[in-house]
């Protein structure tokens, strides 16, 4: 826990904190500008269930339609001594996001995990199929699920 505390203190000294980011997300949403949130999950720094609940609850308080991308960390530069993010941790963050009520939660920086698709929040139909580098198939029709007709939030659908 010492590393986590030191990292938080250093983050506070070297930045304005997270509040300007949170305020910007709220403002952009109020202005009707499409936004997506990405969290790079770094082992020992921001990989607790408490962190995931906090992020998911914040996003949910703004809009359940905001996609949350949960990305794996790989050791590099000044954090070479840390391990890569375990898949189980990423998957737990995804579960927390979905349990909180977010409609669109994705895993990033990992392959062959089966959690990159966009599914209809109402009926579960796969709407968009992806690979690591792009979209394979987009089944959304006029911003609606072709199966149940639910309106699907997004840009360029």
Language-model features: locations:
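Short alpha-helix
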Residues: 87-97
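Short cysteine-rich clusters marking metal-coordination/redox-active sites
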Residues: 120-123, 145-148
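Conserved AdoMet/S-adenosylmethionine-binding subsite of the radical SAM
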Residues: 1-85
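Cys/His-rich metal-chelating microdomains
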Residues: 126, 151
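Short linker/helix segments within small regulatory modules
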Residues: 133-142
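Acidic carboxylate-rich catalytic motifs and surrounding loops in phosphoryl-/glycosyl-chemistry enzymes
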Residues: 108-112, 155
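Short, non-ligating residues that shape and space the ligands of small metal-coordination modules
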Residues: 129-130, 154-155
């Amino acid at each position: 826990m010492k590393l986590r505390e030191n990292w938080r203190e250093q983050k506070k000294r070297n930045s304005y904190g997270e509040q300007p980011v949170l305020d910007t997300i709220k403002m952009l949403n109020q202005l009707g500008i499409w936004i997506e949130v990405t969290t790079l999950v770094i082992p020992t720094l921001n990989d607790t269930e408490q962190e995931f609940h906090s992020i998911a609850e914040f996003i949910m308080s703004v809009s359940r339609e905001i996609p949350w991308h949960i990305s794996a960390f790989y050791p590099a530069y000044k954090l070479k001594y840390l391990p890569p993010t375990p898949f189980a941790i990423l998957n737990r963050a995804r579960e927390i996001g979905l349990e909180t009520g977010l409609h669109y939660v994705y895993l990033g920086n990992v392959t062959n995990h089966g959690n990159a698709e966009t599914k209809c929040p109402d009926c579960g139909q796969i709407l968009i199929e992806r690979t690591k580098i792009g979209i394979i198939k987009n089944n959304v029709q006029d911003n609606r699920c072709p199966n149940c007709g639910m309106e699907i939030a997004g840009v360029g659908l």
